[in-house]
Amino acid sequence: MANAHQKFNEYALFMTTNPAVKILSYVTYISILFHAVDGFLLTLQNKKARPVAYAKSNPAANSGFASRNMAILGTLILVFIVTHMVNFWAKMHFDKKMPLMTTSVTLPGQPQPKDFYVGTQVGQYYMVDQVLADGEKDDAANPMMKKQMKLVGTDMYNVNANVKVGSVYKDLYKITVDFFKDPKIGIFATLGYVLAMFVLAFHLWHGFQSAFQSLGVNNKFTPTIKLVGKVFAIVVPLLFAIIPLYIHFVLK
């Protein structure tokens, strides 16, 4: 799984540094906040417009489960997003103790394997015990024993020349696996994530097509739009739900 480990971290690095992705991410954040606030205000407006319920009503006959419970489903999704951001996004961006990706290699003539930081460029490896951690001071009295490399965040510098020589990966893979495999909360985190994806599927199932209806799109493409919306509402949450299930129950 070493290759999967690195591929996951390569993907995470791309998603957090690519300018186009970052712009789309911020647009998405703003859109979600606007959608949440707008939905909340619309719910309040509807309650004020009709504080007393209809004397006779049969909602099940007029609408589906998702459309009748959009506010509840939306609230659950918002709670999930906040939880997800705290456990993964915030750690990736702001946690000073975020682990860096390492790999163990047994060198010729060495009885025990050594840990190496994995560089973002092909073939870049830095022996962990020869690198100063971010903020660490080298107290070695013998100049020959002093470490030649130091970390500043994820950037690797040559100590003597004070020149950046490369970068290493933040280990989001480890954070993710540890979270879903945690002996105490792993099963609850896994089931909670899957439940959130189930809720998201319901929300998207109704929301995708209702959004086009609200925009007045009603033509020969309407059946296709509805089909695409339903496929999207099922496939995307399903693929995301598979990740924690695989990590918790299959990954060794």
Each PLM stretch: what is its role?
Residues 1-252:
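Membrane-embedded alpha-helical bundles that constitute the cytochrome b-like, heme-associated redox core
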